[in-house]
Amino acid sequence: MSDVLNRFIAYCKVSSQSNPLTADVVPSTESQHQMAEVVAADLRELGAENVVVDEHAYVVAHWPASKGLEDLPTLGFCCHIDTAWQSWGNPVHPQVVTYEGGKLVVGSDREGREVYISPETNPQLEHMVGWQLVTTDGTSLLGGDDKAGIAMLVSLLARYKEHPELKHPRIALAFVPDEEIGHGAALLDLDAFGAAYGYTIDGGPFGEFCYETFNAAEVFVRAHGLSVHTGTAKGQMINASEAIMRFHELLPPAERPEFTEGYDGFFYLERVNGDCESARADYIIRDHDQAKVERRKQLMVDAAAYVNKQIGSEVLSVEIHDQYHNLADIVLKPEYAHLIENARTAYKKVGVEMTCIPMRGGTDGSQLSFRGFPCANLSACYYNAHGVREFVPVPELEGMVDMLEHLVELYTHPQN
């Protein structure tokens, strides 16, 4: 197996899911500390400098510049160590299989149902016949988002160690927790990180490039009702769960994730629970246009007010928090044009045409770019993320390490 494949499989086996229910603590899960220590140990073994793991499971390290290139700006890369919480993620049993075409059964899920991928679910498989794929065994997610990105970066450093003749500026590396629950690397010490600009590696298929993300907010709707014996409830009972249902019905049904694509925004009901006396619904709202996000916020506030007026009591309350912003607002500034053009050139050097897509999500760069680390998003080469059908093609995993080598070499020259 190649170095990057070995590392990827090893990282996948370390469970490190984040948990939105404990998001008030960073990291939200103890397992992310364990993943951070695994990555830090690999960095130290390779000879990276200034390797630090802080109390929040942030890993920061540096790779020194080639001789004569010490005065160039530091190039930064960032990946996240957590995996998604929406699917089972412990234990993870990655497997390497050769795709022979048609339907590929990878295993069975925890209820015994067949788990497979096919050209019907993933048309990209048509050109992957004969390739090795890293898949799940059907019982969990894989974790390519974002452990493929981590493996690529660490493997790149291993290449520099083995081939010191390869030229590169000083490189800063950050591996951060809780990306999947919207934390957005909020506690990354950018002064210690020390990068002038750079990239996150958290995208999908090989060649994908993103400088546009959603603007994002989370919305917490709370209902406080009044429980009365159902036999004598007339004119008295206020059912908190019913109030939440009325509220949800006022949101446009066509603007849900399952009905949207491209630049369409949406409202997403993440979870709901409750009873007569108390109920809650947690939403996220997403849109590439911040003005539309603001309109969505107002619609939810107005919907709650309407329900309260109908009931005749202040049953519903709405709490809104911004999560991240569209990184295009920063990356498209003329002084950062090199982030796009150098990525395009590096992809071409490995025979891939770069595809720019509006990302229907966010990356750590969505916050970091606004905090002073302008960064666009590169491929991590995973497909069907966050579920049991997730897979990573080995040729793409290996090809991205080559792409990163070419990309870094382009930064051995001053940028305009």
Regions found by a protein language model. Give the residues of each.
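Acidic/histidine-rich catalytic neighborhood of metal-dependent amide-processing enzymes
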Residues: 125-213, 254-270, 274, 281-288, ...
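Phosphate/diphosphate-binding glycine-rich loops and adjacent basic-rich segments that engage nucleotide
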Residues: 200-226, 230-233, 237-241
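Active-site metal-coordination/substrate-binding segment of hydrolases
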Residues: 69-170, 175
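Short, conserved micro-motifs enriched in small and acidic residues
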Residues: 30, 140-151, 234-242, 391-398
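N-terminal capping segment at the start of a domain
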Residues: 2-29, 134-135, 227, 383-387
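A non-catalytic alpha/beta surface segment that caps or lines the substrate-entry region
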Residues: 23-72, 76-78, 82, 93
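Glycine/charged-rich beta-loop-alpha catalytic/anionic-binding loops adjacent to active sites
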Residues: 125-140, 224-228, 350, 382-386
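Metal-dependent amide/peptide-bond hydrolase catalytic core
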Residues: 240-416
